[in-house]
Design a protein with these regions (language model features):
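Short terminal or interdomain "cap/linker" segment that borders an active site or interface and mediates
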Residues: 3-6, 10, 110-147, 151, ...
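Intrinsically disordered or highly flexible coil/loop and linker segments, enriched in small
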Residues: 18-22, 33-34, 99, 111-118, ...
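Amphipathic interaction/junction segments at domain boundaries or subunit interfaces
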Residues: 42-149
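Short alpha-helical "patches" and their helix-cap loops
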Residues: 20-32, 71-72, 92, 103, ...
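N-terminal leader/assembly segments
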Residues: 1-66
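Short, mixed-charge aromatic SLiMs
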Residues: 30-37, 78-81, 173-185
C-alpha cells in the first residue's frame, strides 16, 4: 500500500474522539504508527502493516463507522499531491462526475496498491453503476475490513463530486471478490 494512503488513514484516526483514538493507537502500537508516518508518501508499505492499522480501527469503531473512517481517509487522500493531480486531470477530461472518476478507479487502485486485486466499473444507468474488485488476497487479510474500506472510498468519490448517493455490497466472496452497487445524484 502506498504510504500516503496509510498516512491519510492515520490522519483520519486523529480526528476521532480522544477515547477511540487512544484505543486504536494502543492496538496499532507506536512502532507501527511511526513506521507509517516516517515513510516517504510515495513509497510502498507492506500490505500487512496497512491492514493491521485498518483492522485495529475496525476493532474499535465497528463495521459501519469503519466505512465512515475510510470515507474521511479517502477525502484526505484526494487532497494529497499523489491523487490531487490525478483527480484534476481526470475531471478535466471526463468532467467532475462520479461516473468519470469510477471509470478510472483501476488507475487509482494502481497508484495506491500493489497486488490487491483489480477494479472494473460498469455504468448501469445515468447515475448508477457497479464496481467489482477481483483478486484481493482475502486468504491473507481480513477481507471484510477491506470491503468496508473500499465502500468508504467510493462514498468519498461521490462526495468529492458534490453529489449524494449510496454504496451497497451486492456480492462478496471469500475468494477476494466483491461487487458494489453505486447510485448518486447531484447536490
Amino acid at each position: 500500500m502506498r504510504a500516503a494512503q496509510t498516512q491519510s488513514l492515520l490522519a483520519a484516526v486523529e480526528r476521532l474522539p480522544a477515547g477511540e483514538r487512544a484505543k486504536i493507537r494502543a492496538l496499532i502500537g507506536e512502532a507501527a504508527v511511526e513506521r507509517a508516518r516516517e515513510a516517504l508518501p510515495v513509497s510502498f508499505l507492506p500490505m500487512s502493516l496497512h491492514m493491521h492499522v485498518s483492522d485495529c480501527i475496525r476493532d474499535v469503531v465497528g463495521p459501519a463507522r469503519n466505512v465512515e473512517v475510510w470515507r474521511e481517509t479517502m477525502l484526505l487522500a484526494f487532497d494529497r499531491p499523489l491523487l490531487r493531480s490525478f483527480v484534476d486531470m481526470t475531471t478535466r477530461i471526463f468532467g467532475i462526475s462520479p461516473a468519470g472518476l469510477f471509470k478510472r478507479s483501476q488507475k487509482v487502485n494502481e497508484l495506491i496498491t500493489r497486488n490487491a486485486g483489480s477494479l472494473t466499473f460498469a455504468l448501469t444507468g445515468p447515475h448508477e453503476g457497479t464496481l467489482t474488485l477481483v483478486g484481493f488476497p482475502a486468504h491473507q487479510f481480513r477481507f471484510a475490513c477491506y470491503v468496508e474500506g473500499v465502500a468508504g472510498c467510493l462514498e468519498a468519490t461521490i462526495a468529492l463530486c458534490r453529489c449524494t448517493g449510496t454504496v451497497k455490497v451486492v456480492e462478496q466472496g471469500a475468494d477476494g471478490r466483491v461487487t458494489y452497487a453505486i447510485e448518486w445524484r447531484e447536490g
